[in-house]
Amino acid sequence: MSNRKLGRTSSQRKAMLRDLTTDLIINETIVTTEARAKEVRRTVEKMITLGKKGDLSARRAAAAYVRNEIAIKDFNEETETFPTALQKLFNDLAKRYEGRNGGYTRILKVEPRRGDAAPMAIIELV
C-alpha cells in the first residue's frame, strides 16, 4: 500500500501524520490540505479500530503512534484531570463508534487557501 509523499521526507511525513492524527482525536475537527486529510483519514480509521478492540496489544499499538498530549477540551469534573489523547481514544471514541464498522471520518472540501490556492478540506469525526 503506497502513500502520498506530501513534499516531505519519510520521517517528516510520519511525524506530521502522527501530529495531525493526535490533533483530530483531541479536537475532532481540523482544517488541512486535501491530500493531508486523505492520508490522515487512513491513520485515524486504524486508530479508532484499535480503540474499539480495547485489548492490551491494541492499546500498545495505538500508544506507539498517538502522541501523549492532553485533551484540554475534555476536563473531567469528577477526577479534576484532563484525559490524554489515548484515553479519549479508548474511552470516548471507542464507545461512540461501537456499532459502526469503519467510516468514522468525513472530509468536506472548502475554498482554496488564499496564499497559494492549495485545495483545502475539513476533516472531522462523524
From Swiss-Prot:
<dbReference type="Pfam" id="PF01196">
    <property type="entry name" value="Ribosomal_L17"/>
</dbReference>
<keyword id="KW-0689">Ribosomal protein</keyword>
<dbReference type="GO" id="GO:0006412">
    <property type="term" value="P:translation"/>
</dbReference>
<dbReference type="InterPro" id="IPR036373">
    <property type="entry name" value="Ribosomal_bL17_sf"/>
</dbReference>
<dbReference type="InterPro" id="IPR000456">
    <property type="entry name" value="Ribosomal_bL17"/>
</dbReference>
<dbReference type="InterPro" id="IPR047859">
    <property type="entry name" value="Ribosomal_bL17_CS"/>
</dbReference>
<keyword id="KW-0687">Ribonucleoprotein</keyword>
<dbReference type="GO" id="GO:0003735">
    <property type="term" value="F:structural constituent of ribosome"/>
</dbReference>
<protein>
    <recommendedName>
        <fullName>Large ribosomal subunit protein bL17</fullName>
    </recommendedName>
</protein>
<dbReference type="GO" id="GO:0022625">
    <property type="term" value="C:cytosolic large ribosomal subunit"/>
</dbReference>
<comment type="subunit">
    <text>Part of the 50S ribosomal subunit. Contacts protein L32.</text>
</comment>
<comment type="similarity">
    <text>Belongs to the bacterial ribosomal protein bL17 family.</text>
</comment>
